[in-house]
Amino acid sequence: MKIGILSRNPELYSTRKLYEAAIIRGHQARIIDPLLCYMTIASQRPTIHYKGEELTGFDAIIPRIGASITFYGTAVVRQFEMMNIYSVNESVAISRSRDKLRSLQLLSRKGIGLPHTCFAHSTRYTKDLINQVGGAPLVVKLLEGTQGIGVVLAETQKAAESVIEAFKGLKEQILVQEFIEESGGADIRCLVVGGKVVAAMKRQGAEGEFRSNIHRGGKATVVRLTPEERATAVRSAHIMGLNVAGVDILQSNRGPIVMEVNSSPGLEGIETATGKDVADEIIRFIEKHTKPGRTKTRGKG
């Protein structure tokens, strides 16, 4: 097969590993910067050009679309779909997962465990908003934030009011969520491929840090999932319509709590922590499921 890997940086660990895994499995592979693609929207023959040449002959693509290029990146993925090329994660599913509010609404509809969350436009009822999530301490989260950026722990009522009003004063869209204290600054990242958890790690935040992101100094170790945690991760990926997903779970007193479903999960941390070859699992999944025109939208909402 001929596989395109949509990534802006060929030197990134995840991009490199996917490229190498495809080559090892006997496929042709090419890394394509989606921002350098340009497309012709035509009813009879849609095309994509890249650096002056038309891209042809691809059987499948692996989108590695960063949050900062979601709009254009998903447009490129959608154009490949219009050309009957299989995408391991579809454009609509990527867009769905990038909208934190939409994701939470879809997951809640299906009964997935979530943190108590509020969303509001006005700061007029901030006190009641805070009460709705159980009061301080609470977490204020930018809708557009990634890798722990734009996530603030407000430990008191006064601090919570100040943070919410400050973000709103900057015209930012925010979520207000309960703080799951019993998680102890740790979460579980489950890597789901084709409806199965192929690897899982526990990430512990640095001392004094409630965010567990490895980018912020968190430490990763292999973890054994409970059946409920495994089922929650698989169901969450399915609800979002993602074949490949990183599902972030907190362990709470009321069971697994899903914090995020990521459509372009990094591979370095989880492969290093678990010793699992996740890139190989993704290529094997593509081998089994690639068919021309197989771009039926998965998930709803």
Curated annotation (Swiss-Prot):
Binds 2 magnesium or manganese ions per subunit. Pfam families: RimK, Rimk_N. One of its GO terms (molecular function) is ribosomal S6-glutamic acid ligase activity. Mn(2+) 2 binds at E260, N262. Residues 104-287 form the ATP-grasp domain. The keyword Magnesium applies. GO terms for biological process: protein modification process; SOS response; translation. Its EC number is 6.3.2.-. InterPro entries: ATP-grasp (IPR011761), ATP-grasp_RimK-type (IPR013651), ATP_grasp_subdomain_1 (IPR013815), RimK (IPR023533), Rimk_N (IPR041107), Rp_bS6_RimK/Lys_biosynth_LsyX (IPR004666). Keywords: ATP-binding, Ligase, Magnesium, Manganese, Metal-binding, Nucleotide-binding, Protein biosynthesis. Its cofactor is Mg(2+); Mn(2+). Mg(2+) 2 binds at E260, N262. ATP binds at K141, E178, F179, D187, R211, S212, N213. It is an enzyme of class 6 (ligase). Mg(2+) 1 binds at D248, E260. It comes from the Bacteria. GO terms for cellular component: cytoplasm. Mn(2+) 1 binds at D248, E260. Belongs to the RimK family. This is Probable alpha-L-glutamate ligase. It comes from Syntrophotalea carbinolica (strain DSM 2380 / NBRC 103641 / GraBd1) (Pelobacter carbinolicus). The gene is rimK.
